[in-house]
């Protein structure tokens, strides 16, 4: 499951804030932030790969009753995509490794390679396969991927990493040298 952290600017004189999430076209309250100085709320246990809409409004407590202000602008945001899965090595040569994986709902996939003990992003693709080229012969390489979903505000949301896979490149073919006649 995913979580989304909402934050807003302080409203002068507010006793607290009502956090609302769209459901069936309405915005019922999902949280009561009971401090006018608390300016964030994290919504937890949201399903992966969904779009969610939120609004926040300040309130002031007057004689024991809450008097609400107007709603904020709408937050329309995406939750993290599902974890990437099904990563496997499809083919190996002396200088390349072809990876493939299972399609899930996301904007693109990020491919990572373990280099000098650190995972480095080496590619971004919308396909469900990628060929890593220019590798050294007879060398073992490790790879993993993760899905990325981009929301309306161009913010990226990442799923969990796949399990890693490894592949060992083969020995380069012998070079045939022609003999002159």
PLM region spans:
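Extracellular low-complexity, O-glycosylation-prone stalks/linkers
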Residues: 13-31, 103-122, 126-127, 144-146
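Short strand-edge motifs at loop-to-beta-strand transitions and within beta-strands
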Residues: 39-41, 128-130
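Short, solvent-exposed loop/turn segments that connect beta-strands within catalytic domains
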Residues: 25-26, 63-67, 117-118, 152-157
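Acidic surface patches and DE-rich sequence motifs
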Residues: 23, 61-62, 114-115, 149, ...
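Beta-strand-rich modules
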Residues: 43-64, 132-152
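An aromatic-rich alpha-helical recognition segment common to small helix-rich domains
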Residues: 8, 19, 43, 55-56, ...
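Short proline/glycine- and polar residue-rich coil/turn motifs
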Residues: 34-37
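Pro/Thr/Ser/Gly-rich low-complexity, intrinsically disordered linker/stalk tracts
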Residues: 1-13, 48, 66-105, 137, ...
